[in-house]
Curated annotation (Swiss-Prot):
GO terms for biological process: D-alanine biosynthetic process; peptidoglycan biosynthetic process. Pathway: Amino-acid biosynthesis; D-alanine biosynthesis; D-alanine from L-alanine: step 1/1. Disulfide bonds: none annotated. PANTHER family: ALANINE RACEMASE, ALANINE RACEMASE, CATABOLIC-RELATED. The keyword Isomerase applies. The active site is at K39, Y265. Its cofactor is pyridoxal 5'-phosphate. NCBIfam families: alr (TIGR00492). Catalyzes the interconversion of L-alanine and D-alanine. May also act on other amino acids. The modification N6-(pyridoxal phosphate)lysine is found at K39. This is Alanine racemase 1. PROSITE patterns: ALANINE_RACEMASE. Keywords: Isomerase, Pyridoxal phosphate.
């Protein structure tokens, strides 16, 4: 990855904010391992730089969704434990062993297939975390008998290590009894067998709202980056999280639309009076979606409307006359009260803050801020 970039749109990522949020969870759960979830490119922030900074601040365990994500971390010097939360094709089992990556066991059948695919030349250990489906209805084992049988199979092989067991809450960010029911179901199943080194069930919402003394690890994701899983969670907790992302574009051109002139595809905006517009070199290919037409961005402290359709690579904004090329524009801000907060963008897009962040594409340079230090990552120039 290069430390150069040649475009006027980029992300600012506050690594100190991420480290502060990590410390929040370490303080809330002092006797538990914090498995920092850095899947989906660390929710859009950049998994390598985030994981490296978290390791420097005490992280010892990461969770990702795919083996590819785990290998990316290994290739860039991340030596901490890594768990793949998704399902690895059984034929690729040796690659996980080679890179010392723990895997999720979603079913007895998967385990049997995985064992068949371990080459005779492999002598390294394979760490396994069994996934229990306690109500999410996705991956995992639903009954105690099968869970016990899977453990028995693992114990037959010296190379296999039953390292963990976990489940995932479906409604931890909402009011209701389902999360408590899932937690008790999880405890009941785990208590019917030998206990592994790691027992974990709390996502960001669960980690903020629940104690879960039965568990000895937590898996915060979105909240590591400074964002609450829902408004309900934000209102229920007194924990202060620090948002870590800004999305910035610099004006590349200004011009005046005369009355009757239109702008962008479909000519959906037509000026009624002489109107100054600014062109921003960012669009839906960067994760700033077409639905953001009609929203507002911060131009030199002025709230300015996005007019016309957002294009693949460009966005048009109605601005004061004094705005000029080179001026900085905030499209997403790292202040929760800002009109450009991630939550405001999520509401405009009829989605959740997770998706807004994950949509920020890899073609955007990431500028990382660590105190007075500044680092640039451009994944297009490797």
């Amino acid at each position: 990855m290069s430390d150069k970039y040649y475009r006027s749109a980029y992300m600012n990522v506050d690594l100190n904010a991420v480290a502060s949020n990590f410390k929040v969870f370490s303080t809330l759960h002092p006797n538990k391992t914090v498995m920092a979830v850095v899947k989906a490119n660390a929710y859009g922030l950049g998994s390598v730089k985030v994981a490296r900074h978290l390791m420097e601040n005490g992280a010892t365990f990461f969770a990702v969704a795919t083996l590819d994500e785990a290998i990316e971390l290994r290739m860039h010097g991340i030596t901490a434990k890594i768990l793949v939360l998704g399902v690895l094709p059984a034929k690729d089992i040796d690659k996980a062993i080679q890179h010392r990556v723990a895997l999720t066991v979603p079913s007895k059948q998967w385990l049997k297939e995985a064992i068949k695919n371990i080459s005779g030349e492999q002598e390294k250990k394979l760490w396994l975390h069994i996934k229990l489906d306690t109500g999410m209805g996705r991956l995992g084992i639903k009954d105690t008998k099968t869970y016990q049988e899977v453990i028995e199979i693992i114990q037959q092989y010296e190379q296999l290590v039953f390292e963990g067991v976990f489940t995932h809450f479906a409604c931890a960010d909402e009011p209701g009894d389902m999360t408590t029911e899932q937690y008790h179901r999880f405890k009941d199943m785990v208590n019917e067998a030998i206990k592994p080194e790691y027992i974990h069930c709390q996502n960001s919402a669960g980690s903020l709202l629940m104690d879960c003394q039965f568990c000895n690890a937590i898996r915060p994701g979105i909240s590591l980056y400074g964002y609450y899983p829902s408004e309900y969670v934000q209102q229920k907790v007194k924990v202060h999280l620090k948002p870590s992302v800004q999305l910035i574009a610099n004006v590349v051109q200004t011009k005046t639309l005369q009355a009757g002139e239109s702008v962008s595809y479909g000519a959906t905006y037509t000026a009624t009076d002489p109107t100054t517009i600014a062109l921003l070199p960012i669009g839906y290919a960067d994760g700033y979606l077409r639905i953001m037409q009609g929203s507002f961005v911060n131009v030199n402290g002025h709230q300015c409307e996005v007019i016309g359709r957002v294009c693949m690579d460009q966005t048009i904004v109605k601005v004061p006359d004094q705005v000029k090329a080179g001026d900085s524009v905030i499209l997403i801000d790292n202040h929760r009260e800002s009109p450009q907060s991630v939550e405001v963008a999520a509401e405009k897009q009829h989605t959740i803050n997770y998706e807004v962040l994950c949509n920020l594409s890899r073609r955007l340079p990431r500028i990382y801020h660590d105190g007075d230090q500044r680092f640039v990552t451009n994944e297009l120039l490797k």
